[in-house]
């Protein structure tokens, strides 16, 4: 019976650590930039966009596709960083668990 209580305490501790890591991750701000820093985006760890900065020279009325590509590049970079950081922080808690 004592072994079961020990396991429960260990699981509760792990759950608290996991929640703290998740709160820290969600509070972190992640940035993504396009080529030449023409577009910069900022996201929370929950993948909520908080800011976008576009340099005036990125806005060419004759080439809207360029601006779209720059935004996509910056957003994808930020999302990749968030995903990597999430895996680094949370992966230790989910390793070995059936999904």
From Swiss-Prot:
One family name in Pfam for this protein: YbaB_DNA_bd
Compartment annotation: Cytoplasm, Nucleoid
Keywords attached to this entry: Cytoplasm, DNA-binding
Keyword field contains Cytoplasm: yes
Signal peptide (from-to): none
Subunit relationships: Homodimer.
Function, in words: Binds to DNA and alters its conformation. May be involved in regulation of gene expression, nucleoid organization and DNA protection.
UniProt xrefs under HAMAP family: DNA_YbaB_EbfC
Protein name stated in the entry: Nucleoid-associated protein LCABL_24440
Organism the protein comes from: Lacticaseibacillus casei (strain BL23) (Lactobacillus casei)
């Amino acid at each position: 019976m004592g072994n079961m209580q020990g396991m429960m305490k260990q699981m509760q501790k792990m759950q608290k650590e996991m929640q703290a890591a998740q709160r820290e991750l969600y509070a972190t701000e992640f940035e993504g930039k396009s080529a030449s820093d023409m577009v910069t985006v900022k996201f929370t760890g929950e993948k909520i966009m908080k800011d976008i900065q576009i340099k005036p020279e990125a806005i060419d009325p004759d080439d809207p596709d360029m601006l779209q590509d720059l935004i996509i590049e910056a957003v994808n970079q930020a999302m990749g960083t968030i995903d990597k950081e999430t895996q680094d922080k949370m992966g230790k808690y989910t390793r070995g668990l059936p999904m």
